[in-house]
Amino acid sequence: LSWNSSTGITESFLDGVLENWKNQQQLGELLIFPTQDYSAYSSLDILNFIDKNNPKSAIMIIAFSAGVVGAIGAALAWQQLRGEIQGLIAIDGWGVPLIGNFPIYRISHDYFTHWSSALLGGGIESFYADPAVEHLELWRSPQTTKGWWIHQTSTGLKTATPTTARTFIQNVFNSLN
């Protein structure tokens, strides 16, 4: 797993999504990109970080805001180097085209961001907050951010299910494992 954003808010995000994230980090199963040292939007820096940590299996990338720019570029480059991408969760990467041959999931802090970003690649499934929340609130508190999980049924019917950002992210993890 690979994550990026500023440290304090990222810890709040991880607390809201994963119960044992500190153990996973100690075991090397969870990598946190050091945005205090590198730009979150730098695909090259993220790619070098992934390569340096030498993951032994497919990776799931979660990125927030400008970090989505760097993450999609790094994911595509990692694949070019024969690395495996399990999926990308793009949180509030407004205006960032998301195209890849791996599962992509978009999460937005409001409906407008969700709708307008979907024009640039919506991904397999998505989530948007309703009622809308502040941009940083989505990253800080996914467990309390309510909204709609957009997905298709097995018959192709597009469906909206009420949930939280936390539950959406956990469902993505469960579907990929």
Question: Each predicted region: which residue ranges?
Answer:
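Short loop/helix-cap segments at secondary-structure boundaries that form the rim of catalytic
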Residues: 97-102, 117
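Conserved hydrolase catalytic core segment
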Residues: 73-86
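Active-site nucleophile loop of the alpha/beta-hydrolase fold
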Residues: 89-98, 109-112
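Short catalytic/ligand-binding loop motif for oxyanion handling, primarily in non-cytosolic enzymes
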Residues: 8-9, 69-70, 96-99
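Active-site catalytic motif of lipid deacylating hydrolases and related acyltransferases
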Residues: 1-57, 107-114, 121-177
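Residue in the alpha/beta-hydrolase core beta-strand immediately N-terminal to the catalytic nucleophile
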Residues: 60, 86-89
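Gly/Ala-rich beta-loop-alpha elbow adjacent to hydrolase catalytic centers
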Residues: 61-71
